[in-house]
């Protein structure tokens, strides 16, 4: 609230399924007394291993029908968005099922080709999770998921506008490719508005230096410390 954000969807990091289901229940139970919390976004565990970013590889799984059912049951209506790599086994079916359950699926953390990404959007995915980050990039002979998103007027495209995740020329390109469909997100983690130092992202150790969060193990970008007012 101090920085002008009056509503939020809480993004939950990849964890074991039992932990994720417990976290969803926690969000559900908080919502009656917290009108600022609109629900949860699951960023994982249905992500592509090559594009996992700062997610725990030991917890990544395929979106089987049983796991989809467990998540929907645990959420009891609080799950608003879920990021899925559409190329995973059961990926397209999971997107369709979440969509029919009232959840907004998002394509992201993926290594999908153009055709598979299109299938994901046709199945109900209405968001691209932080475009340019944690996905295969633009290539003239292998277009990938980005052109599939920008050409589809149904898709809202997220960008992390901190000058670090995405450089300014690429932010401008995003607005040029999909005017009126760009949504700034923070991808913020626990160190947001806090001093540099050591933090945790799920079970993973993160070092924050000069406001930039990276995994201690391999230096991979581990979310951001961005405030939405600064992104705008």
What is each PLM-predicted segment?
Residues 1, 28, 72-75, 99, ...:
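Non-catalytic positions within long, well-ordered alpha-helices that form the structural scaffold/packing
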Residues 1-20, 36-48, 75-87, 103-106, ...:
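Divalent metal-dependent hydrolysis catalytic cores, especially in the metallo-beta-lactamase
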Residues 21-28, 68, 95, 171:
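Generic structural signal for well-ordered alpha-helices
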Residues 23-26, 64-66, 141-146:
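Charged helix-capping and loop-helix junction motifs
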Residues 94, 116-232:
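Active-site-adjacent C-terminal substructures of enzyme catalytic domains
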